[in-house]
Amino acid sequence: MAQYDAIVVGAGHNGLTAATVLAKNGLSVLCVEKNNWAGGMAATRELFDGFKHNVGAWALLVFRAEMIQRLELEKYGLELIRPRSSYCSFGEPEDTPLIGYTDTNEIMEHLAKDHGPGALEGLGGIYNFLQKYKELVDKELFKAPSSIDTLIAEAPDAETREILLKTVYGSAMDVLRQFFPDPKKHRCIQGSLCASAIDGTHTGPFTPGSGLSLAYHYTLGDAFDFRTPKGGIGALSQSIVKALEDHGGRVQYGAPVKRFCIDNGKITGVELRSGERITAEVVLSSLDARTTFLGLVGEDQLPSDFVYAVKDIEYQNGYIQIHMTLKELPEFTGHLAFANESNIRWIMAYIPSPEYLARCWEQYRHGQVPDEPVSYCAFPSVMDPSLAPAGYYTCTIFSHYFPYDVPPGKHKELSTVMAERAIDQIAKYAPNFRGAIMDKVVLTQQYFESTFGVTGGDFASGLIKPSQMWNRRPVPGYSDYSTPIGNLFMCGSACHPGPGITCIPGYNGAQAVLKKWKK
């Protein structure tokens, strides 16, 4: 007799969600986690004494509030902070910054007053444009997805089909130029919006297919509402842990899995690196597909065409995170001085234009550190003082396009170079910034690969691109969370709908298990 009804591998937010849903439905559940903490690539860690930093994800960018209700997370202590603005995206002094107010009326007033009626019309236009895609997302979100090509073909009219084709297969700028056509007047808005199109991808804003990532980021969650959990991003996972434990499940920390135990094509449990074997009726993996199938299952247990499909998944996702402690907040000057008067400076993003992003992309894809990196600079303790000692502050810079295939001997040198360049981008507009830094640590995709076991350090668990989304995620034929191995299921970001903190792949993976369990 198996020791558990279900074992979930990985205590990130998706793995924990799957475990909790199963436990709530009466199954005995064990979640095994490699590290000594929960959260995966959405954890809050004390990197420096007294300071808490969000390692990996830093806000709920594509989260839907309904998941809080489905998992009853407020009951287990989750409290969300809703900032006045999600970000302030800026460029050169002659460019008007874009402030991502979370209040609809406030952002409309800002666009009309500071950017002109054309910008306000443009925002309304792109919102209506993306609604066509969002209708598909909403219909397919909590189920095994259909083929996107089939959904496009079944669109009610030619105009909708054209919109969907451009969204899925066009570039981000193909979409944005329709609504913000002035390359000079609208370049800061264009740059800010198309920055989402390079997140979780291996593309630039003019690359065909980047429109899909743009649509993904602005339709999957609650747009313009970058909420953050009080206590750090890891507080979300901690609330799910409490829910899991309240329903009889538990997490076993410091328990990396060596291999899956398989008998006659059916999984029977897991073997930990310690040698301990744990049996279960079903196993769910929240890890990426390559780690799951090539690392834990083994090629010899799988059909050759399936192995080929897994090997074909792309994971090239280069980035750095710079976590810092500050003795004072930066004082922005000139055209950004207004940001010092409120918590608008919670996230300051230097993204002058889509052409600027494209230059970074060109250097990155040729293995070079961008001369002037894209830089998101967040000051989380401005919104949540519990993250830092009184009188001090936390700061994190996230920057895309750190070279992907860096020789081991050059990694530290190049990551240091890119970190300094990213800091310079902010210090250029806040002269006291560099002098305010007390401590810092630079993390790249290499750190996330070694610490969390995710292929290539790719936080998307498989890039956002047309050939790796919808019914092709994680691979064609297995978008229903099943696998070629009996009673082995997937439940992580490698599955539909995809990456980001959503809890939806975990929820859907658990539902697939329950559907079979009840038969």
How should these model regions be labeled?
Residues 229, 258-388:
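Mid-domain catalytic core of redox enzymes
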Residues 2-139:
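N-terminal glycine-rich phosphate/pyrophosphate-binding loop and immediately adjacent elements
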Residues 1-6, 24-25, 469-471, 476, ...:
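Extreme N-terminal leader/targeting segments of oxidoreductases
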Residues 186-203, 367-380, 432-496:
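A glycine-rich dinucleotide-binding beta-alpha-beta segment and adjacent secondary-structure elements
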Residues 493-514:
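A conserved FAD-binding loop/helix module that cradles the flavin
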